[in-house]
Structures are given as C-alpha cells and as structure tokens.
Amino acid sequence: MRSWDLSDHEVEPQKPQVLGTAEEGRAVLLSLAAGDSMPDHQVRERAVVVVVSGQLAIEAADGERVTGGAGTMVVFEPSENHAVHANEDSRFLLLLAPWSLEEHSSLDPWSPED
C-alpha cells in the first residue's frame, strides 16, 4: 500500500507532480496560483479532476461550467475539451484512465517521475 496526504504533498504551481502510473491509470497532483489557468485542452484518456483545496472554475467546450472547492469532482470523457481556472490558490488531483504503458513505455509503474 502507498498513501499520500494530498493537502500537504509538495507541488509547485504549474509543475505537475506525477504520483503514480499503471495501465489502470495515472495520478497527477497539480497546483495553480489564484488567477492562473490551464487553457482549453484535451487528453486521450478519461480525465477525473478532484479539487483538494482552493476553488476552481472548470469549463467544458460546450460552455458548461462547474465552480467548486475541496471535494468537487468533475469527469471528462476521452478527447473532451476542457479548461481550468483557479479562482484562488488551488491544488487538485487529476486521474487519467486508462493509461497506456505501451504508448508511454519509459514510465516505471507507480513510481514518481523526477
């Protein structure tokens, strides 16, 4: 078993910290300073965003918007465009699934990347 205290784990704004990777998925902890954004983008995998602290405004390409604090969870289907904006200093967990180890063969399963 491995565990993390996501509210206290070291992560700098705009510098994602990969917590682990396996074929079942990838876990990434991110931090955004108040006013910072991740502009409209997409990923091949299903993306699950879980707000750990702060407040995020998360918007889908169709204009649907969710604003929420700690405990808010938003799910995007594969290739669904979305954007994230920090209304205040925020950290959030991003889960990507499934994660193809074949396509990302240089990664060691469930080992942090340096």
Feature annotation, model-predicted:
Residues 45-61:
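Glycine- and acidic-residue-biased ligand/ion/polar-headgroup-sensing regions
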Residues 38-40, 58-59, 76, 81-87:
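Short beta-strand His + acidic residue motifs that chelate non-heme Fe in jelly-roll/DSBH
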Residues 75, 88-104:
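A short hydrophobic beta-strand segment most commonly corresponding to one strand
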Residues 12-13, 26-43:
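Conserved short histidine dyad/triad with adjacent acidic residue
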Residues 1-28, 59, 69-70, 108-114:
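A short, N-terminal "cap"/entry segment at the start of jelly-roll beta-barrel domains
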Residues 27-28, 36-38, 54-59, 73-74:
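Short beta-strand segments in beta-sandwich/barrel cores
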Residues 62-79:
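Short acidic-glycine-tyrosine-enriched beta hairpin
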Residues 52-53, 69-70, 88:
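A cytosolic small-molecule/anion-sensing beta-strand core signal
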